[in-house]
Amino acid sequence: MRALLQRVSSASVAVDGNTIGAIDHGLLIFICAMPGDTKDTSARLAAKISRLRVFKDDAGKMNLNLAQTGGAALVVSQFTLAADTSRGNRPGFSGAGKPAEAQALYEQFAQDLRALDIPVQTGQFGADMQVSLCNDGPVTLWLDTADG
């Protein structure tokens, strides 16, 4: 699985002009399932993200995780994280997981975060979404479970 994380002071996602998910302080997580990903992959990624110390402590150092700051996660599916731009000018997306499997893993990932006591809001899998955010930092991280 691939995830692009952004530390935010607020974020929301809308479909057809209607807000379907919103958080204040926390992480906006764009997520993409890849071929070969499993429920175990999802659980490991959720655990890793829940432990990431990317929030400032009283000394201003990135030393606190999401739970320690009372933050939430907004999880948004984004198959374009699987883009292959190695040839030509149009990205290819054949490396993304199959839609039915990807949707199941997207939903599993949100559940895995909730099981770790992280409040979670979500987008709508496969929908054309409008995402708004106020980046905090900015802090943006790329995680790929294929990298270990």
Curated annotation (Swiss-Prot):
Q: Which reaction does it catalyse?
A: glycyl-tRNA(Ala) + H2O = tRNA(Ala) + glycine + H(+); a D-aminoacyl-tRNA + H2O = a tRNA + a D-alpha-amino acid + H(+)
Can the keyword tRNA-binding be found in this entry's annotation? yes
> Which biological process annotations from GO are given for this protein?
D-amino acid catabolic process
Q: Where is this motif: Gly-cisPro motif, important for rejection of L-amino acids?
A: 137-138
PANTHER family from the UniProt entry:
D-AMINOACYL-TRNA DEACYLASE 1 (PTHR10472:SF5), D-TYROSYL-TRNA TYR DEACYLASE (PTHR10472)
The annotated subunit structure for this chain is: Homodimer.
Which named protein is this?
D-aminoacyl-tRNA deacylase
Q: Which organism is it from?
A: Roseobacter denitrificans (strain ATCC 33942 / OCh 114)
